[in-house]
Amino acid sequence: VGNGAAALVKRALADDDRGDELHLAQYPNEYDDEIYTSAYAIFERVYAERLTAATGLYDGVLSVLSALAAENIMLSLITNKPRRFTVPLLQALGIDHYFADVLCGDDLEFKKPHPLPVLTALDNLSVNAEQAIMVGDSISDIKSATAAGVKTVAVTYGYNHGMSITDARNDCQADVYIDQITQLLV
């Protein structure tokens, strides 16, 4: 969703399509907390009902996951999405078994871009930063891993708050950029 469901609902109620939290903060709410709470509950219900409606894996993802599993490479999935949506989605896509560890946005005190999720994943897998790489499609992924001392690979597709991750190089710099996930296997 980009900045999370709460920000999406606030933008919808404020009729703001910019998605910029600082921009939103400049304007008083034109709705009260009760309206927001109700709208957010409706959003979550509909989202849960349609969780897999327009969701699929990018080309090459399944073959990369299978190849990494065949090499006994441990994987951790780190997402800012809440656990109640993440686990059913991974199961529906048939990829939950590839991950030794899944960290969701509501599991820890801080979400990406804070380094805590990456540091926790390293600890959970009993590896150090030098033994790991973060593959991500957003500035939050790259910033989180970089702050944790982990090398980064940025995929140039996916969702990065509506902008190309290659255009975000002023905000953060990945170690490597790839256009296809299968390039990880080369």
PLM features: residue spans?
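Intrinsically disordered, low-complexity segments enriched in Ser/Pro/Gly/Ala and basic residues
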Residues: Y27-P28, T37, L75, Y98, ...
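Short linear motifs at secondary-structure transitions and domain/linker junctions
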Residues: Y31-D33, R50-L51, L77-T79, V127-A129, ...
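Conserved short hydrophobic patches within well-ordered secondary structure
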Residues: V1, Y40-F43, L51, I78, ...
